[in-house]
């Protein structure tokens, strides 16, 4: 194949430079421009973003000041750090709803985060919000979750009497703290739950809606696959308003968010989709999350995780922390370290330690049903 014809204004490039290694000999694909600096990209974005969108400037606002990257926007650095972090990778081993499922196609916290990012960036792209900030918040929003589902919050809360354990707050303030993310990213993580104060950015508000849209739709889909529900169980009001298929439902909810932004300039959702989302979520709580079998498993999760926290708090030398050996057993500091360690565990690891350290019989371990 011959080289692509010359592109006007690109004659300064030497496409035969012998000091450059290429993956494919004889490659003809041509970029035709040099990399733009971060400052140039920031200037271009300033004109392209919506008036209320969050502008990436310099290194961003961080707890520990950093020099800016020559090419990457500050929120792109956050996004890269999240993707390369251990807490985010461990989400692959944490359940979304069903603990230790035998079906490999049921969602994990990681696949949920990816789906939230897809929904959120789709909305953000349509209204010219800051995409890397939106995606960083979406991918990181559940990094504070403990093993074995939402029951971990109930398990850990007594050990943190001042604040309790809220996965959103703990994720932003403890789990993700070593990454030194921008304040805007951490704010979106901290406040993505609807019971929290509103996020400070429209990107964070978009993620809050995307999270609810994603989990309401895909948790029902997973419950059908697990045999807990059938497609016919879907409430009629939901079916009428947004359809029966998950793809139709997500599409309808996203269009309703965009319609609300068109009408008001603020992130929200128009009717009848908003009522359908509430009905759908209430149905999921009744028939999936709070059904008797799920509550029985949650009680096992709570006993298991509290047993592990007590075990490590009473023997902090077991903890893989550099300063754990100097901590007084049973102290507040030891308990805080134990909660941080146990909350980061995957389901498989926590269940394994239940057998190894606590003497649980495998048949007594929590299992998703």
Q: At which residue positions do the language-model features occur?
A:
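Aromatic/His-enriched, Gly/Pro-containing loop or helix-boundary segments
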Residues: 162
